[in-house]
Regions:
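His/Asp/Glu-rich acidic catalytic environments and adjacent acidic regulatory segments
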Residues: 1-168
Length: 172
């Protein structure tokens, strides 16, 4: 049975919502036992451990496809796990010319600014790819990838500009 309570303008009840873009706007829950399954059917993975598993499985598949290693740092995986309801890993690429920048600059932009995971070759060096986590299984994932590539390109261009400016001034 429903335990009556209110938080702000929301009252408890038997109706919830699925994923914002992919799920039903209204889902009636008859018993607590069906809650997680009904939400899963509407693209919300309630259990964060299952979200993490889905995310890591997709990241692993991308690594195999690229014949590379995705630098899925635990902190970043955890952060992404709690940012999305239905994780959809994807990968994008960037211009190899950016690999001339120091690795620390590139990984800072990818990991800390964009929450992307760097991709490394068997030699441990960065490859011109990144892995991101979308909260949407878009019909056209290409649009999602293109948008993320554009954002990263702009961030890297800014980083390159400031790196070049820094090199103009000697340290001493």
């Amino acid at each position: 049975s429903v335990i009556p309570f209110e938080v702000g303008r929301s009252s408890s009840g038997r109706v919830t919502r699925g994923h914002r873009f992919m799920g039903a706007r209204s889902i009636e829950i008859h018993t607590a036992d069906e809650y997680m399954d009904k939400l899963y059917d509407n693209y919300v993975i309630v259990d964060h451990n299952k979200r993490r598993e889905k995310m890591l499985s997709g990241i692993s598949a991308i690594g195999k496809e690229l014949a590379a290693t995705v630098d899925a740092q635990p902190r970043l995986v955890e952060e992404n796990c709690f940012l999305v309801e239905y994780p959809v890993p994807f990968y994008g690429s960037f211009d190899k010319a950016f690999l001339e920048l120091p690795e620390e600059v590139l990984t800072t932009v990818m990991v800390h600014h964009q929450r992307y995971m760097p991709v490394r070759g068997s030699d441990g060096k960065l490859k011109p790819y990144f892995v991101g986590i979308s909260n949407n299984r878009a019909t056209e994932m290409g649009v999602v990838v293109d948008g993320n590539e554009r954002v990263l390109r702009a961030r890297f261009a800014d980083a390159a500009f400031f790196w070049e400016k820094d090199l103009e001034r000697p340290l001493s």
